[in-house]
Amino acid sequence: MTSMYFVAGLLLMIVQGSWQSPLQETEEKSRSFKASQAEPLDDSRQLNEVKRHSQGTFTSDYSKYLDTRRAQDFVQWLMNTKRSGQQGVEEREKENLLDQLSSNGLARHHAEYERHADGRYTSDISSYLEGQAAKEFIAWLVNGRGRRDFLEEAGTADDIGRRHADGTFTSDYNQLLDDIATQEFLKWLINQKVTQRDLLGEYQ
């Protein structure tokens, strides 16, 4: 009989274990199902963030690459134009001119020096004329000519009538009023007896 109890107990344990196993599996499955439903949201959010970050990094890196590439292309273009471009044409023309001059009896070195001297002379004359023009303009301003010269040269009643339309009359009138106001202020200042107490009282 004990063996019968033993077999019955063993059978009961197996049945109970088989019942508990599916229950645990269903609980685990339901937990994992709930977690798996929540995780895809987190995973998709993380995936989107990683994707956006990687896209931003890619875009940034690609922009840097394009900038570097453009700079390299520009430098290459400059080097190519320097080698075979406009400067090359100018240098060939210069060489041809110097060869012609040397074949006509002028020394090559002398022709180069003469061209340099001509350019230098032209540059010096231009600088001198610019300086003279600036000096004349400043002298013209200092002497207070300008609009008055125009009026003296014009001399007709129509030209004088145009002063207001040109705005010079208004400007001259404002200047006259400013001069009168300055003179009145100076007269008042001279005639006033200002003491140190008055000055300190104003600024306190």
From Swiss-Prot:
Disulfide bonds: none annotated. One of its GO terms (molecular function) is glucagon receptor binding. It comes from the Eukaryota. One of its GO terms (cellular component) is extracellular space. It holds the Pfam family Hormone_2. The record marks 52-53, 83-84, 115-116, 148-149, 163-164 as: Cleavage. Induction: Produced in the A cells of the islets of Langerhans in response to a drop in blood sugar concentration. Isoform LPII is expressed in both pancreas and intestine. Expression of isoform LPI is restricted to the pancreas. Neither isoform is detected in salivary glands. One of its GO terms (biological process) is protein kinase A signaling. It is found in: Secreted. The modification Arginine amide is found at residue 145. Residues 1-20 form the signal peptide. Keywords: Amidation, Cleavage on pair of basic residues, Hormone, Secreted, Signal. Residues 84-109, 149-161, 197-204 form a propeptide. Its main location: secreted. Belongs to the glucagon family. This is Pro-glucagon. The lineage of its organism: Eukaryota, Metazoa, Chordata, Craniata, Vertebrata.
